[in-house]
Regions:
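Mid-domain beta-loop-alpha active-site segment that forms a flexible
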Residues: 247-257
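Conserved hydrophobic packing residues within short motifs/helices of P-loop NTPase cores
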Residues: 66-68, 243
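Glycine-rich Rossmann-fold phosphate-binding loop(s) that bind the pyrophosphate
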Residues: 69-75, 247-248
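Short alpha-helical segment within the catalytic ATP-binding CA
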Residues: 75-76, 253
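Aromatic pocket-lining residues of Rossmann-like dinucleotide-binding sites
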Residues: 81, 257-258
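Short glycine-/polar-rich loops that comprise or flank the Walker A/P-loop
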Residues: 213, 262-263
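N-terminal FAD-binding dinucleotide-binding subdomain shared by FAD-dependent oxidases/monooxygenases
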Residues: 2-65, 82-209, 234-237, 247, ...
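A conserved hydrophobic secondary-structure block that centers on an alpha-helix together
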Residues: 92, 215, 220, 230, ...
Length: 349
């Protein structure tokens, strides 16, 4: 048997293995397999980072623009609109601060796998240098707050407030936005920047409601129980047996921290995660300070183009994301030339 034949057999066995595993996870109930955080499970969605609900009277006001969401989407919208002259803006945010995903997800080890010089917006405008190539969650959260302060958005925000309805009035050409705090906001424009990574999702495990131990969701990390408000302090778990359900990106970041801190750790895994090198490191201050004005927009566009298969003369980011696209493009080219590498380019994604 030739070396190529042996390689092809290994590839086929691997494909079959993943086909079988994939079929195990194809379910007729789809996303309905998960339990909604309401009723007896509503406590999973409570905000552990805000002391109390800030009391205020319902507001009825007219504004130019209502932005729903105080994460990067909402912050960018507000910042860009402010830059072109709009000052009458109201931001509606369910959390008690800006940050969106990074307000809610404060679990130990939280980190972004997109390069900070691309992912963290408005670095030039705010005048901030990320501390490392792939920033941790607390730094990203603080940058969100810095954006809010830099553009004066705190005075224009309604925190701990959720939009419950929006109605368009054709006669007056205005939106009427209603909130769970009894507010009625009238605006010419409505911007929805709500995102999809802020709502907890529970596994549909029979009997989960009967568990008698302490239980919380990673996106509502209970630091009062695990140690303190310090993300590095899990000292209260030293004598605890802990189970974590799930082995996705969050677990990959949480598990090493838990393993060092608890008496015994159980990781409940259905599907193994893809693991690769982190490739992280501190920001080169000299490099950063010598970047030319407009560098971030150029870098973001370059990264977007490369990861979407658009030809660029230079790969400015040159990390795992861009390398993956380079490999896919090369596999497609080889296939087009009639060279069988034994690899379906789409399987690389």
């Amino acid at each position: 048997m030739s070396e190529n034949d042996n390689l092809q057999q290994k590839i086929e066995r691997m494909k079959e293995k993943y086909r079988v595993e994939r079929e195990k996870r194809l379910r007729s109930d789809g996303s309905d397999q998960f339990v909604e955080v309401k009723g007896k499970f509503s406590y999973f969605s409570q905000d552990p980072y805000a002391q109390d609900l800030a009391e205020r009277e319902p507001i009825e006001e007219t504004t130019d623009i209502v932005i729903v969401g105080g994460g990067f989407g909402g912050l960018l919208a507000a910042a860009r609109l402010s830059a072109i002259g709009y000052s009458d803006i109201t931001v509606v945010e369910e959390g008690a601060d800006f940050g969106g995903t990074w307000y809610w997800n404060r679990y130990p080890g939280a980190q972004c796998d997109i390069e900070s010089y691309v992912y963290m917006p408005l670095l030039e405008e705010v005048g901030y240098m990320p501390s490392e190539k792939y920033a941790h969650g607390d730094e990203i959260f603080e940058h969100s707050r810095a954006i809010g302060k830099h553009f004066g958005l705190y005075d224009q925000a309604l925190f701990q407030t959720r939009m419950i309805d929006a109605e368009w009035n054709e006669d007056s050409s205005t939106w009427k936005v209603l909130t769970n705090r009894g507010d009625s906001l009238y605006a010419k424009f409505l911007v929805l920047a709500t995102g999809n990574l802020t709502k907890p999702k529970l596994p549909g495990i029979p009997g989960i409601e009967k568990f008698e131990g302490h239980m919380f969701h990673s996106s509502r990390w209970d630091y009062k129980y695990t140690g303190s408000n310090d993300r590095n302090d899990l000292s209260a778990l030293r004598d605890k047996r802990v189970a974590i359900i799930g082995s996705g990106a969050t677990a990959v970041q949480v598990v090493p921290n838990l393993a060092e801190s608890v008496q015994q750790l159980y990781v409940c895994q259905r599907t193994p995660s893809t693991i690769d090198i982190r490739g992280n490191g501190p920001t080169d201050k000299n490099w950063f300070e010598n970047l030319e004005p407009g560098w971030q927009e150029k870098r973001i566009q370059n990264f977007t183009n490369v990861t979407n298969g658009v030809r660029e003369d230079e790969d400015l980011v040159a990390d795992g994301w861009t390398d993956l696209m380079h490999k896919m493009i090369e596999a497609y080219r080889e296939k087009k030339r009639g060279v069988d590498l034994g690899v379906d380019p789409t399987s690389l994604a």
